[in-house]
């Protein structure tokens, strides 16, 4: 069977819970790794230079800072974020259509000023740590979790951005409404038998790809492994 995609290009490794030295040691052990995710923890620890350092090592960067503020602030933040060269940048869909539009317009401007292609902006719908019961009880939102995800994905699409972040459990329905090239990127990925940690809405890698995920965010299954290369290659093999 000939694959229509490269398995390694479907996986984004979350670089959480590590120092800069540990990040670079891990990267050296993963020659087939293409995508890395820089989240709030690593960005706060090391600043924007970590993105340049990862790109210098040939990695594509998913900058997952989940910007959520008034439109002007979101625009200014995404303008600066785009100048780092990150290929993917997240905003919260709950920031609203105006905020997302301003973020997208400013990101395009920032990238252009430094001679880079514009990043893809992705809207976070509902965090995968939320379960349906907690979602209603704690936030008081009288919508089902699925309904809320659909509403926010539609908002993101109407704002003109390139995709959204959702759990793998919502992907199949969203993919029917939003065909490629709209990106559906999914955390909450665990191979069979792996600890689910703080995720609630999960699937295996192959299940998520079959459901319509564009890319999968993986983390502790690789970063906590005694042999990260074997763990990464094992996940890749599950997609073949």
Curated annotation (Swiss-Prot):
Listed pathway(s): Pyrimidine metabolism; UMP biosynthesis via de novo pathway; UMP from orotate: step 2/2
Keyword annotations of the record: Decarboxylase, Lyase, Pyrimidine biosynthesis
GO biological process, alphabetically ordered: 'de novo' pyrimidine nucleobase biosynthetic process; 'de novo' UMP biosynthetic process
GO cellular component annotations of the record: cytosol
Matching CDD domains: OMP_decarboxylase_like
EC supergroup of this enzyme: lyase
Disulfide bonds: none
Molecular-function GO terms, alphabetical: orotidine-5'-phosphate decarboxylase activity
The keyword Lyase is assigned to this record: yes
Residues annotated for substrate binding in this entry: 16, 37, 64-73, 128, 190, 199, 219-220
Domain of life the protein comes from: Bacteria
Catalytic activity: orotidine 5'-phosphate + H(+) = UMP + CO2
Pfam short name (any one): OMPdecase
Keyword rRNA-binding carried by entry: no
E.C. numbers: 4.1.1.23
Catalytic residues (positions): 66
Record InterPro entries: Aldolase_TIM (IPR013785), OMPdecase (IPR014732), OMPdecase_AS (IPR018089), OMPdecase_bac (IPR047596), OMPdeCOase_dom (IPR001754), RibuloseP-bd_barrel (IPR011060)
Assembly and interaction partners: Homodimer.
Function: Catalyzes the decarboxylation of orotidine 5'-monophosphate (OMP) to uridine 5'-monophosphate (UMP).
Family classification: Belongs to the OMP decarboxylase family. Type 1 subfamily.
Protein name: Orotidine 5'-phosphate decarboxylase
């Amino acid at each position: 069977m000939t694959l229509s995609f490269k398995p390694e290009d479907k996986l984004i490794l979350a670089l959480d819970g590590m120092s800069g030295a540990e990040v670079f040691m891990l990267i050296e052990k993963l020659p087939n790794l293409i995508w890395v995710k820089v989240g709030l923890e690593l960005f706060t620890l090391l600043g924007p230079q970590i993105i340049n350092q990862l790109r210098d090592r040939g990695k594509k960067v998913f900058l997952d800072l989940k910007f959520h503020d008034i439109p002007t602030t979101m625009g200014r933040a995404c303008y600066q974020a785009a100048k780092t060269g990150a290929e993917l940048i997240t905003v919260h869909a709950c920031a609203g259509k105006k905020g997302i539009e301003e973020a997208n317009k400013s990101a395009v401007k920032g990238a252009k000023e430094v001679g880079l292609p514009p990043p893809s902006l992705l809207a976070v719908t509902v965090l995968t740590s939320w379960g349906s019961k907690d979602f209603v009880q704690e936030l008081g939102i009288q919508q089902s979790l699925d309904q809320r995800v659909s509403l926010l994905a539609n908002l993101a699409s109407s704002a003109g951005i390139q995709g959204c972040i959702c759990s793998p459990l919502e992907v199949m329905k969203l993919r029917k409404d939003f065909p490629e090239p709209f990106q559906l990127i999914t955390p909450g990925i665990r191979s069979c038998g792996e600890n689910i940690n703080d995720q609630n809405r999960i699937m295996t890698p192959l299940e998520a790809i079959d459901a319509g995920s564009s890319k999968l965010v993986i983390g502790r299954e690789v970063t906590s492994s005694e042999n990260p290369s074997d763990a990464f290659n094992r996940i890749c093999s599950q997609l073949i």
